[in-house]
């Protein structure tokens, strides 16, 4: 049985983005109408739709959510993979903020990080296109290019047999996306906004992937261990199977945990 649930930016790391128009944003959240993509037995809405719902629920200050520093890679492959995920997530946030200079900076950083994990060739064209489309302020096209860059990176990593690292890219993007979602919702709380966090199946999915890591050294990596603990701590807050409402206090707790983890990923060794 397939599961459908809401989530900011998860599709960024797991599925293709569908460009959409602001006037198409619904007045309230109807998950059954979200364009979605399937990962194994999990169906997720595309990020543009979730962003538009947030815009409809309030007026997020996207520029305030963009990180000034993208972080520094340590050369440690797990950290670089997680960092790459956060940087690509940052790209979508910068697009929502319509910050052309930040988008171009992120495009360059994606290329640099891809080089560290030996998949630079997979994103050279995308990086150039991100810069060109950002200069033209063609935000829909930039969204598509960021999603394409992620898919190219993941595909190249899997071709190299780096399946576990590819999952870490996904998790890095999800963690950063969840940090931003909880930040926005906590500043203008509503039950509809908080409902975007209800995602027990995804937490189980990521936990299974971490538990299935075969490389002992990777499985014991400090950041991987930290993320495993974070998922376990978040599950009772956003993984309620009974559909219980997620309170503003829970949203703030999730934000604190994801923010600390993003900080560990982006500043480790910096």
What residue spans do the PLM features occupy?
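Bacterial N-terminal signal peptides that target proteins for export
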Residues: 1-8
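Bacterial N-terminal signal peptides
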Residues: 8-16
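Sec/Tat signal peptide C-region and signal peptidase I cleavage site
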Residues: 18-22
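N-terminal Sec/ER secretory leader and immediately downstream segment
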Residues: 23-130
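Long, amphipathic, charge-rich alpha-helical segments that form helical bundles/coiled-coils
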Residues: 69, 78-90, 110-117, 121, ...
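Secondary-structure edge/capping motif, primarily at the C-terminal ends of alpha-helices
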Residues: 91-98, 117, 121, 156-160, ...
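Extended amphipathic alpha-helical interaction segments
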Residues: 133-217
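A cross-kingdom marker for long, charged
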Residues: 215-270
